């Protein structure tokens, strides 16, 4: 593997008991190792001094320079807790929300180990959605730019032959969705992961929520037992616990979130109580109030995502849809346009709630409330990131009161009602009504195209490619 520049690395991360601070923070871990073969737990605490740089964590200068180039000024809590333990060769369970910097938390130790012993098929990262897989690959390539790391993205919706060619070039890192990876393991001649050194399951709770469990079992059976495994998840459900027992060896658990429903202090959250029949009018009014700012509008269904996109476009807004039934190229194109601000409004199902690399969103509008509090937190977490301020407004109709009260209960606080003048809103009624009629015509054409496609490919059990995309 001549492309990776090999050099001898002395890990600077302290071993257990090598200094006073490390010993005190991990004392219970050592005790658990002595008494039973249970998983260790290393909870992040505010009492330990935060490392000032990635070098403090044991990351070599070459990778530290890459961090600086990417704008990583100081380690995030999940990076500060995970990286030293990963450099010690431990299996890890990382409990952290999206936007916490967890990709670098597993990418940096893997890249550092790759520099010590370069080989093909060194690391495998499994992700629940295609977009997240491309994002992770981009992070690996950026962090590993100085060592010429080669990555292959293996996801559904893309050409199998070109992916087989990419695998034939023996990349260092594979980032994949489970369905398409299993297709290649079963059907691509000469492709094997018998020499794999690192496995990462990112957003494991979503992998299991999307029924990837049986596919993960098949993948795990063909991987070598002698490997390092990192499992990252926003929550620790019973399914995730079962997965970690089946795939990890005496892992350390790192948790950086004391409250799974916690939102950042720079996020201004409110709700808008309104009649269901007037939701479109209120939406247009709010977008006029936030004109010039980037916004994500969350809906519950593909149909509503498309309808609102058509509605807003007819009114002159730069809106673009994002949902799981778009082609892969269309989804990546939508994200690219939104990131570049050539379109400033993204209308999306919950495919955009977690894991996507959208660095700057000013406003989140929950046009349709999510059915659970966890999804609400992930949605509003798309704004007010990296210390910036943000606004999240949720539409609460007469049919949503019970759901909204559950969300407020999970947050542990009552949110303020967004104040506006109803008379000013209803001035837009006639204009929005015309746009609604136009959107109905466009939706009819859209649904006819979808129906033709469904008949062409037939109905029945979801294919692995369909499982490789977010529901909705």
UniProtKB/Swiss-Prot annotation:
Pfam family, one: Helicase_C
Keywords: ATP-binding, Helicase, Hydrolase, Nucleotide-binding, Nucleus, Ribosome biogenesis, RNA-binding, rRNA processing
Reactions catalysed: ATP + H2O = ADP + phosphate + H(+)
Protein's cellular compartments: Nucleus
Motif (DEAD box): 202-205
Sequence motif Q motif, location on chain: 52-80
GO terms for MF: ATP binding; ATP hydrolysis activity; RNA binding; RNA helicase activity
Subunit structure: Interacts with the SSU processome.
Recorded domain comment: The Q motif is unique to and characteristic of the DEAD box family of RNA helicases and controls ATP binding and hydrolysis.
PANTHER family, alphabetized: ATP-DEPENDENT RNA HELICASE RHLE-RELATED (PTHR47959), RNA HELICASE (PTHR47959:SF20)
Similarity-based family: Belongs to the DEAD box helicase family. DDX47/RRP3 subfamily.
Name of the protein in question: ATP-dependent rRNA helicase rrp3
Gene that produces this protein: rrp3
